[in-house]
Amino acid sequence: MAGTKEIRTKIKSVQNTRKITKAMEMVAASKMRKAQERMRNARPYAEKVRNIAAHLASANPEFKHPFMQEREVKRVGMIVVTTDKGLCGGLNTNVLRAVTNELKTLQGRGVDVQATAIGGKGMQFLSRIGAKVVSNVVQLGDTPHLEKLIGAIKVQLDAFTNGEVDAVYLSYTRFINTMKQEPMVEQLLPLAADKLAQTEEEKRAYSWDYIYEPDAQTVVEDLLVRYVEALVYQAVAENMASEQSARMVAMKAASDNAKNVIGELQLDYNKTRQAAITKELSEIVSGAAAV
């Protein structure tokens, strides 16, 4: 059995670790609330752009944007959204497992894949498996800025427009609630027709027409690009909210485990100390009897 000094050292070490995990839990909880707010604020913009684009597309059916053109899929672009940091449970593992499964499916059909990494963990993973990475952005910080993302996103959008890829997929972690996050792999391009289809309610709400400057085609082109960029930004915002939630839960679990370990070590310490005292008393009694 370990001595009391060794056990005290272990207790001190675990206590220090628990202080760190507890602090990280509190920081993650604070960042999670801010990340959720950013995520909620991003949704109305994307939805408003979609509504206007849908209205313009229905008013100008003769115009077909390249983002809506279906082609035989021989080459695919994959945008992989992960975190820059670890200590967030199985968040990155789950989404990268979904990406791996999708890559195996595509490669099994003879489809070439080129990837864009958003987040350091995704970049490390893609480099490790030897994937073709055409663009990346890392170190986004706690607040994602669209201007940091546009350069990496544009590489895939231009590749689709120029016919270099026939589809673009987006993988990220969708935020469900604090305790649940879901890995997603969705088709970003070509845009599904139902995404730009107006409901009856939207048709009534957008029953007017616009005066276009310079012309309807240019406006629709710009709007659809902004819409796709907004979808990627929304995915990054959801991923960040998921990251902070997962980190808070992981650090709470670590703090709870540390508390249990401290309790067990304290019990061992008490037993060891009691055994040492009992031994000393026995030696004193034996010595007194001998005299």
UniProtKB/Swiss-Prot annotation:
Which Gene Ontology cellular component terms are annotated? plasma membrane; proton-transporting ATP synthase complex
A UniProt-annotated Pfam family: ATP-synt
Where does the UniProt annotation locate this protein? Cell inner membrane
- Which keywords annotate this record? ATP synthesis, Cell inner membrane, Cell membrane, CF(1), Hydrogen ion transport, Ion transport, Membrane, Transport
Q: Quote one Gene Ontology molecular function term.
A: proton-transporting ATP synthase activity, rotational mechanism
Instruction: Kindly report the protein's main subcellular placement as a broad class.
Output: membrane
Q: Does the keyword Mitochondrion apply?
A: no
Which Gene Ontology terms describe the biological processes this protein takes part in? proton motive force-driven plasma membrane ATP synthesis
Q: How does it sit in the membrane?
A: Peripheral membrane protein
Q: Which InterPro entries match?
A: ATP_synth_F1_ATPase_gsu, ATP_synth_F1_gsu, ATP_synth_F1_gsu_CS
Report the function annotation for this chain.
Answer: Produces ATP from ADP in the presence of a proton gradient across the membrane. The gamma chain is believed to be important in regulating ATPase activity and the flow of protons through the CF(0) complex.
Q: How does it assemble?
A: F-type ATPases have 2 components, CF(1) - the catalytic core - and CF(0) - the membrane proton channel. CF(1) has five subunits: alpha(3), beta(3), gamma(1), delta(1), epsilon(1). CF(0) has three main subunits: a, b and c.
Record family assignment: Belongs to the ATPase gamma chain family.
Protein name stated in the entry: ATP synthase gamma chain
Organism the protein comes from: Cupriavidus pinatubonensis (strain JMP 134 / LMG 1197)
Q: Lineage from the top down?
A: Bacteria, Pseudomonadati, Pseudomonadota, Betaproteobacteria, Burkholderiales
Q: Which gene encodes it?
A: atpG
